Amino acid sequence: MFTLKKPLLLLVFLGMISLSLCQDERGADEDDGGEMTEEEKRGAFGNLLKGVAKKAGLKILSIAQCKLSGTC
């Protein structure tokens, strides 16, 4: 039981630090008045997700083409 206390305490401590940093940054954004809209957030994440999905799809297609043609 004693061996689990230190890592668990460390995880809780790091989680609290990251949470407080997020809250500080959120508060700074609200003070500036330059708040990012929900559409901008989704647009940035959507573009990243599309890029990753496109690369993964191309990789899967190239592997399938290789296996079907027997050139692997």
Swiss-Prot record:
GO biological process, one term: defense response to Gram-positive bacterium
Main location (coarse class): secreted
Record Pfam families: FSAP_sig_propep
Keyword tags: Amphibian defense peptide, Antibiotic, Antimicrobial, Cleavage on pair of basic residues, Cytolysis, Disulfide bond, Fungicide, Hemolysis, Secreted, Signal
GO (cellular component) term, any one: extracellular region
Propeptide residue intervals: 23-40
Intracellular or extracellular location(s): Secreted
Cited function: Antimicrobial peptide. Active against a variety of Gram-negative and Gram-positive bacterial strains. Active against fungus C.glabrata 090902 but not against C.albicans ATCC 10231. Shows hemolytic activity against human erythrocytes.
Protein name: Brevinin-2SN3
Source organism of this protein record: Sylvirana spinulosa
High-level lineage: Eukaryota, Metazoa, Chordata, Craniata, Vertebrata
